């Protein structure tokens, strides 16, 4: 499983955990195709995002412009959380790669408007709370 697919599956698992309040293990298992195994990268993204969820929500909450964390779509929230986890806690991936992958995921799930929304929120969050250079 490559990193792009790992991110996609991680967002799907995070979405499920948010919507139907399932365990991390069940959410990961349910998004995998038959015979597919979760990569360690995917598992790390999901577990790290869940572990730091409250902190990640605080990072971007002030940059939603007229929205609250609870009001944004579940998929957008999952993408923002995972992207910020990757930007702030995963040291071996360049920031621009993590940033662009989040925008592409948003476009894949919600179209151009979703991509612009994620781009705007991530940009403002990163300006306010600069992650260490990778």
From Swiss-Prot:
A GO term for molecular function: RNA binding
GO annotation, biological process: DNA-templated transcription termination; transcription antitermination
Record keywords: RNA-binding, Transcription, Transcription antitermination, Transcription regulation
UniProt GO cellular component terms: cytosol
Pfam families: NusB
InterPro entries membership: NusB-like_sf, NusB_fam, NusB_RsmB_TIM44
Family named by the database record: Belongs to the NusB family.
Function comment: Involved in transcription antitermination. Required for transcription of ribosomal RNA (rRNA) genes. Binds specifically to the boxA antiterminator sequence of the ribosomal RNA (rrn) operons.
Protein name: Transcription antitermination protein NusB
Species assigned in the record: Halalkalibacterium halodurans (strain ATCC BAA-125 / DSM 18197 / FERM 7344 / JCM 9153 / C-125) (Bacillus halodurans)
């Amino acid at each position: 499983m490559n990193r792009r697919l790992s991110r996609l599956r991680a967002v799907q698992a995070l979405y499920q955990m948010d919507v139907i309040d399932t365990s991390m293990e069940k959410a990961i298992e349910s998004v995998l195709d038959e015979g597919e195994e979760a990569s360690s990268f995917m598992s790390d993204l999901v577990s790290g995002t869940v572990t730091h969820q409250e902190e990640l929500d605080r990072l971007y909450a002030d940059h939603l412009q007229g929205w609250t964390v609870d009001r944004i779509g579940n998929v957008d929230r999952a993408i923002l959380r995972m992207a910020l986890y990757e930007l702030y806690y995963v040291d071996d991936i360049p920031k621009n790669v993590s940033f662009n992958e989040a925008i592409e995921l948003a476009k894949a799930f919600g179209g151009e408007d979703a991509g612009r929304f994620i781009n705007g929120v991530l940009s403002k969050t990163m300006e306010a709370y600069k992650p260490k250079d990778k």
